[in-house]
């Protein structure tokens, strides 16, 4: 393909993507929210990342209409991971923010110091990124109350795509309602579109303290058992990839 035809084809693809976003907005149909979870294992320059998030990234995302939560380990001071959860209205909003942040001169100016300082020594030893969409347009992000200081980030893996589909349906049609009835304070349910481990689903319950957490999970168990054993939901989960207890940092949106 010559350059002219390539550019023409690229333009058509770009226009198609833009048009699809416009159609979504024009039709005013509810879209699934999109979530991005980054898990950073901090290096000795880790404080630079926290400063960048507080002073540059979060204000820029706020100007673009996105919400950002930043979390560290709830109790383990030796755990040097940092969790960053960004909430977008839909996939079009996600794309708008990813592109728009680089057009924000305030952000570019504010963040340049971070980019300069980490150009020869990253703030993270490793980074995992999960891109998700809500399990249903009906399930929207609910920011945990300020009193819910203990949060869990739970990642479940299914054995295959068919099992994953049934696990998502289980959450959407039955399990999420049990969480609501048990007052587990779940902020979001995310079906993973891409990430280091798939097929997976991620969700975040929240509690006032560990004692309440234990009591709520104990209450949840008997309500969950009847649906867990339904034929349509059998063998839809392989393992718990991780279950991390986290707390919000002072500059986190939630």
Please state what every model-predicted region is:
Residues 35-41, 69-102, 150-158, 190-192, ...:
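Short, well-ordered beta-strand segments in beta-rich or mixed alpha/beta enzyme
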Residues 76-78, 121-124, 145-149, 195-197, ...:
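Extracellular/periplasmic catalytic domains that process cell-envelope and extracellular macromolecules
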Residues 7-13, 29-32, 47, 51-69, ...:
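An amphipathic, aromatic/His-enriched active-site/gating alpha helix that lines ligand/cofactor pockets
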Residues 134-208:
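Surface-exposed interaction/gating patches
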Residues 5-24:
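N-terminal export signals
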Residues 21-39:
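C-terminal segment of N-terminal export signals and the immediately downstream linker at the start
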């Amino acid at each position: 393909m010559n350059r002219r035809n390539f550019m023409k084809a690229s333009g058509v693809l770009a226009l198609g993507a833009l048009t699809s976003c416009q159609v979504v907005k024009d039709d005013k149909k509810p879209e699934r929210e999109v979530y991005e979870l980054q898990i950073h294992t901090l290096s000795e320059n880790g404080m630079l990342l926290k400063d960048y998030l507080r002073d540059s990234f979060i204000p820029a995302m706020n100007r673009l209409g996105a919400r950002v939560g930043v979390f560290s380990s709830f109790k383990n001071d030796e755990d040097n991971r940092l969790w960053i959860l960004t909430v977008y209205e839909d996939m079009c909003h996600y794309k708008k923010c990813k592109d728009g942040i680089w057009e924000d001169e305030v952000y570019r100016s504010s963040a340049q110091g971070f980019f300069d300082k980490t150009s020869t020594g990253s703030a993270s030893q490793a980074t995992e990124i999960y891109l998700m969409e809500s399990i249903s347009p009906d399930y929207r992000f609910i920011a945990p109350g300020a009193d819910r200081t203990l949060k869990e980030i739970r990642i479940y893996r299914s054995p295959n795509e068919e099992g994953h589909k049934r696990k998502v349906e289980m959450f959407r049609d039955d399990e999420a309602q049990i969480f609501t009835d048990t007052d587990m304070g779940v902020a979001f349910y995310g079906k993973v579109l891409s990430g280091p481990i798939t097929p997976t689903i991620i969700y975040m319950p929240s509690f006032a303290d560990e004692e309440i957490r234990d009591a709520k999970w104990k209450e949840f168990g008997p309500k969950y058992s009847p649906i867990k054993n339904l034929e349509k939901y059998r063998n839809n989960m392989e393992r718990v990839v991780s279950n991390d207890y986290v707390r919000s940092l002072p500059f986190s949106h939630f």
